[in-house]
Design a protein with these regions (language model features):
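Positively charged n-region of N-terminal signal peptides that target proteins for export
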Residues: 1-4, 8
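Functionally critical loop-and-helix segments that line ligand-binding/catalytic clefts
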Residues: 26-95, 236-291
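Bacterial N-terminal signal peptides
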Residues: 8-16
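Structural recognition of alpha->loop->beta junctions
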Residues: 164-186, 233-258
């Protein structure tokens, strides 16, 4: 597996002429007129779009612990820090619903990692091969997620095995965890099958999926949000595995356990992707502490 080098997030603000405020770091977008961007290194510049609604501008907030990389010299120095993530990376999570992604443009927009859906239930995501190979080609760090429709522990184990089989050709290119994604849609599906989903069952399924994934040599984690974690995941499993928390608010109020990734927005724009895309921060220091 290639080592994760220390790329620290560039936290920038872009002021758009004739617009009364500077765009916040909640949305990355391509600004066609390049003179509107800052003078930072093109390789690291983040181009932020703006929203007209003042309320919308408060949706997300960049983390306070982000270190600003001002030039290529600092970037090269950061790359030498023991092959570990030392700060905060900015990334996206994608699936077939994001269409045909231009990964070269995504990389150029400043995206440093992508969590790619490998599949759901027992089914491969139709865009998985295209997405992961595009990310690899453009030196974007890779994580995986699997949307679960399991309603027994055995089903969760089988999903993990199917996932491991699908991602096997790219094992050495996967830098971040493989995440178990279980949501209210998963619960609704189980109910339609006449199955009851309890907190104990969901906790056991998550643990079974993650344990199975780690047996194949991957790091494992759980995707969740504050409400779902309170209702369906026991604290023991949340403490055991890497946590990817979804909270589309200005600040993250999840305090149940440590988390190493935060999905902070779902209506963002990134050059190379048509329509909205989910945005994430990956906290390297927290990730290192939990391993």
């Amino acid at each position: 597996m290639k080592k994760i080098i220390a790329l620290l997030l560039v936290s920038l603000m872009v002021c758009v002429p004739s617009i009364s405020y500077c765009a916040p770091a909640d949305i990355i977008f391509d600004i066609i007129n390049r003179e509107h961007s800052t003078n930072s290194s093109r390789a690291m510049e983040l181009l932020y779009s703006f929203k007209k609604s003042a309320k919308a501008n408060k949706d997300n907030k960049e983390p306070k612990d982000v270190k600003i990389i001002k030039n290529e010299k600092e970037l090269n120095e950061a790359n030498l820090q023991k092959g570990k993530i030392q700060g905060t990376l900015i990334g996206i999570d994608v699936s077939k619903w994001d269409g045909n992604i231009n990964w070269k443009q995504v990389k150029g927009a400043g995206i440093q990692f992508a969590v790619i859906r490998a599949g759901y239930g027992y089914t491969r995501d139709k865009k998985f091969k295209r997405n992961i190979e595009g990310a690899i080609k453009n030196d974007i760090y890779i994580g995986i997620y699997w949307f679960s429709y399991a309603y027994t522990v055995d089903m969760a184990v089988k999903e993990a095995k199917v996932c491991a089989d699908i991602i096997k050709p790219y094992k050495n290119e996967i830098d971040l965890p493989v995440y178990f994604d279980y949501e209210y849609d998963s619960v609704d599906y189980a109910h339609k099958q006449g199955k009851s989903i309890t907190k104990v069952l969901t906790t056991n399924m998550a643990d079974a999926f993650c344990s199975t994934i780690t047996s194949y040599g991957y790091e494992a984690g759980i995707y969740t949000n504050l409400d779902f974690s309170n209702n369906y995941f026991g604290k023991s499993v949340l403490e055991k595995w890497q946590i990817w928390i979804a909270q589309w608010t200005r600040t993250n109020t999840y305090k149940k356990t440590d988390y190493s990734m935060w999905q902070y927005g779902a209506k963002s724009y990134v050059k190379g992707i048509k329509g909205y895309v989910d945005m994430d921060y990956f906290y390297g220091d927290k990730y290192e502490k939990k391993n």
